[in-house]
Every structure is written in structure tokens, then in C-alpha cells.
Amino acid sequence: MLLIIDLQTAFINWFVGLGVSKDISAALWIPLPILVVIVGATIGVLVIVWLERKISAGVQQRIGPEFAGPLGVLQPLADGLKLVFKEDIIPSKADIWLFTLGPALVVIPVFLAYLVVPFGHDLVVADISLGVFFWIAISSIAPIGLLMSGYGSNNKYSFLGGLRAAAQAISYEIPLSLCVLAICLLSNSLSTVEIVEQQSAYGILGWNVWRQPIGFVSFLIAALAECERLPFDLPEAEEELVAGYQTEYSGMKFGLFYVGSYVNLLLSSLFATILYLGGWTSPITFSIPFQTSEIEIFAAFLGIGMTLLKAYLFIFLSILTRWTLPRVRIDQLLDLGWKFLLPISLGNLLLTASLRLAFY
């Protein structure tokens, strides 16, 4: 049984009960979902930064942050405030427009992609029929911002980092898209909500990860490369390029690159959950014979918690990968994308299409 909560109707009725007119209540609802997405993604980034510090400390047998709040949970907030109040320096020979627009062009598309991420049947800002392809298309804009930042800095290390970012994005965007296309072919839909609902019938046994194991592994590798996580962080390799395209940046512009990186990591983990692990659905199927407002609220929180739990499992694996695997060379990175992942993901798509024609 699908437990559906209509948040818009509940919100408007609640304000009408307080004496606010229905038109004003409907107008107040319009910016609320976008505001919730921005605040939620920002809080998710703070949690990821804290987890990265604590997990890396555990891998290296250290304690990690412990003074800024209990268990150091306020350390990411302190780091963010430090970057906000630092001086914003623009190199004298840099292209001011490219240098300034680059970080914004990296962050804004990633936040826009959250509009199609569902946390429940009606817990999605925009349930569009091309939700999956909207994510792929909008996330393809970020490498342009990285290239602009590297070119506009008028620095050889920044320019090389921007070129590497563009080459890496092109190399791994194609296998990632082919893996997603196989899921869409299997689900007969491009809507993120319908893809999750298609996996909800048999609990954990209905998840796409069992029907697409090759695509799942290929998707994870390509997603790590798209997020520029170790062992694929060639665009900002410290030993080779100082800080890559970030070399000349300081203050809040420098912080925007980190925000974009972690927001993109959370977004990729959420889409891995949606496409392969059933999204908000529980591993164990259950049905409730009646439906009340309290049960609807409980179902909404259960869906959000289930989605985030699965997503943070991927984030934990990516953090563990960063601190346990060495960085690959740029030629190895491109060989992995073009000579290994591309043929495998293409073969997986052809196999999925063949099985679809044979058994459906």
C-alpha cells in the first residue's frame, strides 16, 4: 500500500485555520519547497564534512575534531564561517568575469538537480517525466564552470586543472548516462518517482541492483569520477597542480568549490539510491489497512529517513575509498573511462535491451 501525504494541501489548510486567506497561503507555499531543498542540501553538506573528518581520523588512528561542539559536530560550520570572512582576492591579470562566474556555474546547476530527487511519492519538488535526463543534462554544466575558472585565473596550474576537469567529465559522463539509460529501459520510465515505484513491489528483492549488477558497479565508479573523488581527483591533484582550478581562489569563492563538490557527492548518492536501491521504499514490504494523518506523517519521515540512510551508505564508501586508495595517473583515468567503463556500460545497455525484448 502506498502511503501518500499531500503536503501542499496540509500546509494551505493549516494556514487557513490560522486565519490566513487561501490565496495568500498558496502564495506562501510556492517558495517553500525550493527553500527546503537549499537548506536541506546545505545541512547534508555539513554532515558529510563532519563524517569525512571523523572517518578519515578513524582510518589514520586519530581522534579528529572534538572541540567545536560535542564530538566536533560544529567544526564544518566553523570552517564555513572562516571562509566567509576571509578576503576575496582576484589576481591582477585574471579575467574578472570568468573568474567570478566560474564558482557560481559549478554550484547552481547541482542545487537545481535536487528539484527532481524524490523522498516520497509526493515529497518531490518537480515530478517531471524526464527527471533522470534533467539531472544528467543539468549536471553537465558544472565542468564548463570549472574550465572557466581555470582559464580565467591566468595561471598554468589552474588552466591544467580546468582542462583535466573537462576531459574527466566527458570521459565519465557517457558511461554514467548509459547506465542510467539501462535503468530507464528496464523501468519503462524517465521519471524518478516512477522508477522508485517500479521497485516497491517485492521489497529488497525488487530493487534494480539485483537486475543491473554490472550497471550498478559501473555507475558507482563513474559517479566517483564525476564528483572528482579520490582516486579520481586529478583536476585538483595537490602534488602536481597545487590545487588545480582552485589555486588562485580564496574566501567564499574557494568555499563554493567545496560546497559544489560535496553537494554533488550527496546528489550522486541519492540518485544511486533512487535508481538501484528502491529510493524511499523499505527493504521489507508491509501494508497498513487504514490511513490517518499521523500515519501519513510517519510514512513521510520514514521515506526521508530510508532515502538518506541508503545515500549516506554510499557516502561512507566514497569517504573510505578516498583514504584507502592511491590516486591514479591521468592516462590511467582516461583509459579506465574509454577502454573499460564505456564498453562495459554499452554492453550492459545492449544486454538489457535484448532481455527486455525477449521476456517483456
Curated annotation (Swiss-Prot):
It is a multi-pass membrane protein. It catalyses: a plastoquinone + NADH + (n+1) H(+)(in) = a plastoquinol + NAD(+) + n H(+)(out); a plastoquinone + NADPH + (n+1) H(+)(in) = a plastoquinol + NADP(+) + n H(+)(out). PROSITE patterns: COMPLEX1_ND1_1, COMPLEX1_ND1_2. Its main location: plastid. One of its GO terms (molecular function) is NADH dehydrogenase activity. It is an enzyme of class 7 (translocase). The keyword Glycosyltransferase does not apply. The keyword Membrane applies. Signal peptide: none annotated. Keywords: Chloroplast, Membrane, NAD, NADP, Plastid, Plastoquinone, Quinone, Thylakoid, Translocase, Transmembrane, Transmembrane helix. GO terms for cellular component: chloroplast thylakoid membrane. Its EC number is 7.1.1.-. The chain crosses the membrane at residues 29-49, 96-116, 128-148, 166-186, 204-224, 255-277, 297-317, 333-353. It is found in: Plastid, Chloroplast thylakoid membrane. GO terms for biological process: aerobic respiration; photosynthesis, light reaction. Pfam families: NADHdh. NDH shuttles electrons from NAD(P)H:plastoquinone, via FMN and iron-sulfur (Fe-S) centers, to quinones in the photosynthetic chain and possibly in a chloroplast respiratory chain. The immediate electron acceptor for the enzyme in this species is believed to be plastoquinone. Couples the redox reaction to proton translocation, and thus conserves the redox energy in a proton gradient. HAMAP family: NDH1_NuoH. Belongs to the complex I subunit 1 family. NDH is composed of at least 16 different subunits, 5 of which are encoded in the nucleus. This is NAD(P)H-quinone oxidoreductase subunit 1, chloroplastic. It comes from Chlorokybus atmophyticus.
